[in-house]
């Protein structure tokens, strides 16, 4: 009897403290766009308005929703897809044991109950990509949805997609996803990588990591599984994922040929693309820019080729002494992508893996090829984003952004960090967040998170939380620097709460309320400390904000408005302060 993954096997948490799930009604019946509303307490009887923020947590934080992982989450978008009349349901390919990396299916594998569902594809001659609709002047329901999330006009969304500056990753077989957009003129997004390996993790653990990552703010998920049960793990994740899901198909294709790179073929890879597209993967990382002639250039590098996908294709090219089959079959890949609206994430297989290799000939040669491939994909109206480095010192980061925008005609940039130094294993979420904040400011549309386990091991769910929060900080800092019109509202609300000693509001407005309260309560755990006009850093006598309050009150009581009057008042106050023994609080 096949096993199942249940909600009891994983930890699911409700909404964050002081928050509640709310929905904004869209322009069409039944369209409800999720937001998180953070409540605030009053200031001396004067109400502070609730703050609404972008929410990626899906239905899991809705108290009215009953979690049943074996059924998957709701599919409100399904009707939008069908009503356009350009898709058809079909039998799909047969799921085989080798899809899960085994010769015989195991009775112990928790197969998703609805794996026999019929996938959708475009009807003969149709193109179902959001870019195709946008270029034909159509504002889809998906575009209207993301316009509400971003606080912009739907026509602006359509135009950005039509011109290739943004992508709306939305496979027609992933109707569970709550739509989002990736582009430099929108909020900077964060991706979280999850996935098993040959030596670690289970299906339940990966589903839990997905719900955990989205709770803390991951905008997309990449399933980078390389162990057994790849197909089944991905099915459980997609059916329960409220955010777009990306993959690197070459990983599964390699499993199908027993991990021997030189045995890879276009036919095996093509079959894998269709398999994953039928499941509902929203974007594929495809390392089509690793060309045979570029591989020798990497021989001079300190760390060679560090991309897993890049090294697989380099090994294949060298063994056969042939051009990369992902490059030679790129037009055929585009034909597959546009049948399902899978977006390209053109992989940087030659990204630098060390500071010494940053911005070298190999890296930028591949980027030139990615620019060429972008034009081909756009010819098919297939959505494209470009993957970027890697390990880059701060003074070389801006050049990466400028070259990408120029060479790839403004396609969204999606970067891994970049890490700004190589000397901090165990802290690479910090070394990379520095670079991520900078490159986000310069124009990167999505940041791929790095966890503290980078270069050391497979991250657990606590590492996922740390990585997501760290990168949400970087993304938000970039939004502030770019002048995003709503970015500062949460900062202003938290600053006001801090100055007014509304401790619970400070916690609740933060990116990680639980961590903030935990640190505060380590030294001041009493409930009364939540209303105290000091914290344990300065204590009651040296709190700068409390002193500022005293100064304001003094100015108000003495009707001091001009600089001259304030200086006079300060002299009087200084005299009084000395006469009372130099004590701040009596």
UniProtKB/Swiss-Prot annotation:
One of its GO terms (biological process) is thiamine biosynthetic process. Its cofactor is [4Fe-4S] cluster. It is an enzyme of class 4 (lyase). Pathway: Cofactor biosynthesis; thiamine diphosphate biosynthesis. Gene3D superfamilies: 6.10.250.620, Radical SAM ThiC family, central domain. GO terms for molecular function: 4 iron, 4 sulfur cluster binding; carbon-carbon lyase activity; zinc ion binding. It holds the Pfam family ThiC_Rad_SAM. Its EC number is 4.1.99.17. InterPro entries: ThiC, ThiC-associated_dom, ThiC/Bza_core_dom, ThiC/BzaA/B. Zn(2+) binds at residues 391, 455. It comes from the Bacteria. Residues 1-58 are annotated as: Disordered. Residues 22-39 have a biased composition (Basic and acidic residues). Keywords: 4Fe-4S, Iron, Iron-sulfur, Lyase, Metal-binding, S-adenosyl-L-methionine, Thiamine biosynthesis, Zinc. It catalyses: 5-amino-1-(5-phospho-beta-D-ribosyl)imidazole + S-adenosyl-L-methionine = 4-amino-2-methyl-5-(phosphooxymethyl)pyrimidine + CO + 5'-deoxyadenosine + formate + L-methionine + 3 H(+). One of its GO terms (cellular component) is cytosol. Catalyzes the synthesis of the hydroxymethylpyrimidine phosphate (HMP-P) moiety of thiamine from aminoimidazole ribotide (AIR) in a radical S-adenosyl-L-methionine (SAM)-dependent reaction. Belongs to the ThiC family. This is Phosphomethylpyrimidine synthase. It comes from Bacillus thuringiensis (strain Al Hakam).
């Amino acid at each position: 009897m096949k096993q199942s993954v249940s909600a009891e096997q994983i930890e699911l948490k409700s909404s964050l403290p002081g928050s509640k799930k709310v929905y904004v009604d869209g322009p069409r019946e039944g369209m409800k766009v999720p937001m998180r509303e953070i409540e605030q307490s009053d200031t001396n009887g004067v109400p502070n308005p609730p703050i609404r923020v972008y929410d990626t947590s899906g239905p899991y934080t809705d108290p009215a929703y009953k979690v049943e992982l074996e059924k998957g989450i709701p599919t409100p978008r399904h009707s939008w897809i069908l009503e356009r009349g350009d898709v058809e349901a079909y039998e799909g390919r047969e799921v085989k044991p080798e899809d899960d990396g085994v010769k015989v299916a195991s009775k112990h594998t928790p197969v998703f109950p609805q794996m026999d569902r019929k996938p959708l594809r475009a009807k003969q001659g149709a193109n179902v990509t959001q870019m195709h609709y946008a270029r034909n002047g159509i504002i889809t329901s998906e575009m209207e949805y993301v316009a509400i999330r971003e606080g912009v006009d739907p026509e602006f969304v359509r135009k950005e997609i039509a011109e290739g500056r943004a992508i709306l990753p939305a496979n027609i077989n992933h109707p569970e996803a709550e739509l989002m957009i990736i582009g430099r003129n929108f909020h900077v997004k964060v991706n979280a990588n999850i996935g098993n390996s040959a030596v670690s993790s289970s299906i339940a653990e990966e589903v839990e990591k997905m719900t955990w990552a989205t709770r803390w703010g991951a905008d997309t998920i990449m399933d980078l599984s390389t162990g057994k049960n790849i197909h089944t793990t991905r099915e459980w994740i997609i059916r329960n994922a409220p955010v777009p899901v990306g993959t690197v198909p070459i990983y599964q294709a390699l499993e199908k040929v027993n991990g021997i790179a030189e045995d890879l073929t276009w036919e095996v890879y093509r079959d894998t693309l269709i398999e994953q597209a039928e499941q509902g993967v929203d974007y594929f990382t495809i390392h089509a820019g690793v060309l045979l002639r570029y591989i020798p250039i990497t021989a001079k590098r300190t760390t060679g080729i560090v991309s897993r996908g890049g090294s697989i294709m380099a090994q294949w090219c060298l063994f056969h002494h042939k051009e990369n089959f992902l490059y030679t079959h790129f037009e055929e890949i585009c034909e597959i992508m546009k049948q399902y609206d899978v977006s390209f994430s053109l992989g940087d297989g030659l990204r630098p893996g060390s500071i010494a290799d940053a911005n070298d000939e190999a890296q930028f040669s591949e980027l030139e090829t990615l620019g060429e491939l972008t034009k081909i994909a756009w010819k098919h109206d297939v959505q494209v984003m470009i993957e970027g480095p890697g390990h880059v010192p701060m003074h070389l980061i801006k050049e990466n952004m400028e070259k990408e925008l120029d060479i790839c005609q403004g396609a969204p940039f999606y970067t891994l960090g970049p890490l700004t130094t190589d000397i901090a294993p165990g802290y690479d979420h910090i070394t990379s967040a520095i670079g991520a904040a900078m490159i986000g400011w310069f124009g990167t549309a999505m940041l791929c998170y790095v966890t503290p386990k980078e270069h050391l091991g497979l991250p657990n769910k606590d590492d996922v939380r740390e990585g997501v929060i760290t990168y949400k900080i970087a993304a938000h800092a970039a939004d502030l620097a770019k002048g995003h019109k709503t970015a500062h509202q949460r900062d202003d609300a938290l600053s006001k709460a801090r100055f007014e000693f509304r401790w619970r509001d400070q916690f609740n407005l933060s990116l990680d309320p639980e961590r903030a309260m935990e640190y505060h309560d380590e030294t001041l755990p009493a409930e009364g400390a939540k209303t105290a006009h000091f914290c344990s850093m300065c204590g009651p006598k040296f709190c700068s904000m409390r002193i500022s309050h005293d100064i304001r009150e003094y100015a108000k009581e003495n009707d001091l408005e001009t600089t001259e009057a304030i200086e006079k008042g300060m002299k009087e106050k200084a005299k009084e302060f000395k006469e009372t023994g130099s004590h701040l609080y009596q």
